[in-house]
Structures are given as C-alpha cells and as structure tokens.
Amino acid sequence: MLPLQSAMRFYMSFGTIFKTDKTALGKEKMMRYGFTTGSCAAAASKAAAYMLLTGRKKENITIQTPKGILFHAKILEITRKEKEVTCAVKKDGGDDPDITSGALIFSTVRLAKEDENPIEEGAGEKKVRIKIDGGMGVGRVTKPGLDQPVGNAAINHVPREMIRREVEEVCALADYKGSLKITISVPEGERLAKETFNPRLGIVGGISILGTSGIVEPMSSQALLDTIRVELNQKKAEGYEIAAVSPGNYGLDYMKKTYHYDLDRSVKCSNFIGDTIDMAIAAGFQKMLLTGHIGKLVKVAGGIMNTHSKEGDCRMELLVAASVKHQVPYPVLSGILQCVTTEEAVKKLEACGKKEAVMQELLSKILFYLKKRAAGKMQIEVILYSNDCGELARSPQAEAFLRELC
C-alpha cells in the first residue's frame, strides 16, 4: 500500500503517478513522479528476458517498485538475436529531474552456459542462474566502502534485487531453468558521470544504477519544508512531547533491532536540520531527539545546518579535525582524507583504537551547534550511528528520550 503523508495526495493518470503538494500559501501544485535508473534497468531486463524466452515482441512492460508503485515502461531500441535480446527504457525523472533524466538505460539478456554463470552472492538457491554486470557507460567500483565491492559494476544492491526478481518472474512464466547473463549499459553514461560525484567516489567509466524505493519523488525545497512543518504540527497535536527527527531511513534496521524504535515513526527532516529545529520550536516542542547516520550528522559538527552535498561536503575534513585533537597517527589521518565514505573512515579509527574518543568529540561539536540553533528554547539529544559499526555516540539524555517515545 502506498503511504500517504498528511500534506500530500497521490493520483494515477494513464500510468503516470502524480501528487499534489500544499505550498506555504496553501495552494496546491501538481507534481509528477519519476523512476530511478534501477527501475529502468529492471524494466528493460524484464522485457528483454520476456522477448528472449517467449519469442514474442514486447513494447510495454510493468514492474513493481520497492515503494509499491507500479512502473509502466515503454520499451525502446529493441534488437533481437538468436541467443540474446537488447532493449532500453528512457529514464524519466518526473518533476525532479537529475543529470540522468532522458538517458536510455539498456539491458541485454543473453542465454548463458552453466559454467560461465556462477550464482551471485544473495541469489539464493533459485533454479535459474542469473549473472548481472555492467557494460558501456555503467561505472566500475575502484575504491572500498561503497554499496558494491571493488571490481563490481556500480549497480547497487536494490536495483540488482529488482532485476533478479523481475527476470525470475519471466523465467517462471516461460518455465526456463537455465542460465542468463544480464548486462546493463548506458551509452551516454561516461559523459554524464563527469557531472556526478562518481569520479570522486572512485567509480570510473560511467554512472551508477541506483535507487532504494524505485521512484523519484518530486520534491521542491519548499514542498519538503512544508511537509516537515505539517508533520511536526501533527505530532504535537497528537500529544507528543518529544519531536523525534531523523534525516532519513539509513540505519532503519539497526534502530529497530537495538532500540526497538521504528524510524518510520520519526519526522524525516531530509537535509534541513536547522530549519527543522526552527519549525519544531514554532510547533511548541521543548524536546527533540535527533537520530542520524554519521554521513549526515558529521556535517553538523562544522555548523552546517543544511547537509545537502551542494551546500558543502567537508565530512572527512571534520573527521580529521576531531581526530587530530585525540592524537590519531598521521598515516590514519591521511587515510581518512582518502576515504570515500564515512563508514570506511570510522573503520580506520576503530582499527587504531580511537573511534570512541573521536566520536565523542564529534558529538560534542554536533550538540554545540544544535544548541546554538535552538538558542535555549529546546533541549536536543542525539544518537549517532553507522550501518556497519552500530551506535557511535549518544548524548546523556538520548536513551531516556527514546524510552519515552517507545
């Protein structure tokens, strides 16, 4: 079921998903959803597999995204051969387009021999053997710490799961139990990647195939702020005394397992840490619990209250600054500056025995800037975590706030 937020309504018209956002002036603006490169790759793969295994042409295909929304894709650039089929889906970013909007995402599905298709990790014991790789214009991972290991195509795990699920569905329909090789390619990918963070992240040769929900939600900054404001006001009206806030769903499983707290119950502030503090105070809250991944909250240690990468990215520099204060050896400092992700940097600190001290230093800086923004009008507590290392630091009253919320 599609979750509804209080400030939004969703509509479907001729296979296109729309929603209306209430603006700050109370007016409604119709906005159109887009679909991720991962959804496009899954749709193209499903169509190519269908044409290969049934021999019938397919000009439209439907897949279900992880969000629960159906993607009705038009199939383009079909090339059929005896043992393989290639086709494409055009990336449509909706009303929140990015650099990949309009790009053709191709999938080639080829009949493969059993011995050339070892089952990928996480594939399970399916009767059909599927190998997923990247071709022209899909980046290749060269640095550790990313979603995929070094050497793999930059096709993240959720798109891989989507591709596998949709192709397995076709294989079951066609009663096919052999092996398939799936290659995702983006002809414009290498050019487009120059305008992304991929070169800096150590992803070379093209773009990444991304997406966790399968859809691109159209959100202007004002629409996001309006939604945050509505949700905070709603929580206050429901009798909550503590504003539970998180930037997103990173660490969702960790928070459920460790604290029995569902991040879905918190107000998602996205990148707007400072604005959310202001709005929570305006809504009448005197307490806030901010739970967040170090990749976002480390920026707050530098006084950055909008954590979007376009506003500034000094994550490693801030980690190094905190590390210097605790005599972290120079080789480790140098290594941190070369890290792609904060997860990787935390592991370096853990390896040299300085993780706890540095995380406490960061937490003190985060609290300093949060309290400065609140200006004495609200008590703010923080839980800082990483996906791989779990809890990194928490402020003195954070656990008490969490117990009250649960």
Model regions and ranges:
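Hydrophobic, Leu/Ile/Phe/Ala-enriched alpha-helical segments that form helix-helix packing faces
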Residues: 48, 159, 163-174, 231, ...
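Extended hydrophobic packing segments that form well-structured cores
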Residues: 129, 160, 363-406
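Surface-exposed flexible segments
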Residues: 106, 258-261, 395-401
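Intrinsic structural disorder/low-complexity segments
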Residues: 5-8, 102-104
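Flexible, glycine-rich phosphate/dinucleotide-binding loops
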Residues: 191, 252, 391
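A structural signal for small-residue-enriched, beta-sheet-centric alpha/beta enzyme cores
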Residues: 15-18, 32, 38, 201-207, ...
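Generic N-terminal targeting/processing segments that precede catalytic cores or assembly contacts
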Residues: 13-195, 199-201
